[in-house]
Curated annotation (Swiss-Prot):
Active-site residues, as the UniProt record annotates them: 324 (proton acceptor)
Positions annotated to bind L-ornithine: 216, 282, 286-287
Record's protein name: Ornithine carbamoyltransferase, mitochondrial
EC number(s) given by UniProt: 2.1.3.3
Localization per Swiss-Prot or TrEMBL: Mitochondrion matrix
Keyword Membrane: no
Length: 370
């Protein structure tokens, strides 16, 4: 009878499954040149409109409108047909949402993919494991991560370590998908058909008046406007102005632009709306600011957008109104919100087309925006 086969002693299970090379690669304290974050094959992410050239931003807006027209007419563009077939997109939302979730999940489905929603009860960034570990593991199993988080540092860390594209669906500093939808809405309403260079969307010289809190939606809107040659006047109560570091980012967004949009700030709503084509506001109390609600409501008294404010301040005769939603009555009067000047509901719908355009550019086309 032959003797039993003898095998060489095996290393401990932990060492076998975690060899030195992998320990170096996935260490949370040391990242060599071989890590996904610094690899020459690292994906391109959309964290802010500041990440885009003027031409790229205008292209995303134009593609959103083009896909909207085609799909609504019953013709799915060839570039989108089954573009995400067999692919999973992780929807990592640590903040609740209505429009963002419906629009991004709907966009993935329209393109043939599978959206996997991971809410705050499913995954808590940086709580049970490091953001590094989460980014590496999740990105190894999906085609893209769409992240709606609290802090910009969280989505930036996800992108730094993800091997797949990360699209920022909102953080405390930026909201790029909203900016694409906003400029799609403005372009569809104001731009002369077939006129204007690609970089400008035909909107050069337009003026936006923002009346309310200086927040993430405003920041990406102002960055976009600077790139597109659109002027922005911001009216906030004292103490609620755009932070200095964000002003520097907005200023830098105009570099290389022939006629960048101008940004001015005031504490007087009437001064901001003078000569404005579009009046915009947003919530005065964002998620996470609930304890400040009473003080904020007092501080923002007099900043409600009304027809009387527009008339008193001298907005242009054909002015229009926008709001990213959800809306509260203290921010804008019913007469404006539900009136003929409101672009609010087309703006909300355009979130779907903006998401489709972004997924096409950053996931399907690997960051090549064309």
């Amino acid at each position: 009878m032959p003797s039993p086969l003898r095998t060489a002693p095996q290393p401990p299970l932990r060492a076998f499954h975690n060899p030195p090379a992998l320990r170096r690669l996935y260490s949370s304290t040391s990242h060599s040149a071989a890590t996904p974050a610094t690899s020459p094959f690292a994906p391109r992410h959309l964290l802010s409109i500041a990440d885009l050239t003027p031409t790229e931003f205008a292209t995303l807006v134009r593609n959103a409108s083009s896909h909207k027209r085609a799909i609504k007419s019953g013709s799915i563009p060839q570039s989108l047909h089954g573009a995400l077939s067999g692919k999973t997109v992780a929807m990592m939302f640590s903040k609740r949402s209505t429009r963002t979730r419906i629009s991004t999940e709907g966009a993935v489905v329209q393109m043939g993919g599978h959206p996997m929603f991971l809410g705050k009860d499913d995954i808590q960034l940086g709580v049970n494991e490091s953001l590094y570990d989460t980014a590496v593991v999740v990105s190894s199993m999906v085609e893209c991560i769409v992240a709606r988080v609290g802090k910009h540092a969280d989505v930036a860390d996800l992108a730094k370590h993800s091997t797949k594209p990360v699209i920022n669906a909102l953080c405390d500093s930026y909201h790029p998908l909203q900016a694409i939808a906003d400029f799609q809405t403005i372009s569809e309403h104001f731009a002369a058909s077939g006129k204007g260079k690609l970089e400008g969307l035909g909107l050069n010289g337009l003026k936006i008046a923002w009346v309310g809190d200086a927040n993430n939606v405003l920041f990406d809107m102002a960055i976009s406007a600077r790139k597109m040659g659109v002027d922005v006047a911001v009216a906030t109560p004292k103490g609620y102005e755009i932070p200095k570091e964000m002003l520097e980012i907005i200023e830098k967004a105009g570099e290389g632009v022939k006629s960048p949009g101008k940004l001015v700030q005031t504490n007087v709503p009437e001064e901001a709306v003078k000569g404005a084509d579009v009046l915009v506001t947003d919530t005065w109390v964002s998620m996470g600011q609930e304890e400040e609600a009473a003080k904020r409501l007092r501080d923002f008294a007099g900043f409600q957008i009304t027809s009387e404010l527009a008339k008193r301040g001298g907005a242009k005769e054909g002015w229009r109104f926008m709001h990213c939603l959800p809306r509260h009555p203290e921010e804008v009067a019913d007469e404006v919100f539900y009136g003929h000047r409101s672009l609010v509901f087309p703006e909300a719908e355009n979130r779907l087309w903006a998401a489709i355009s972004a997924l096409e550019g950053f996931v399907v086309n690997k960051g090549k925006i064309e």
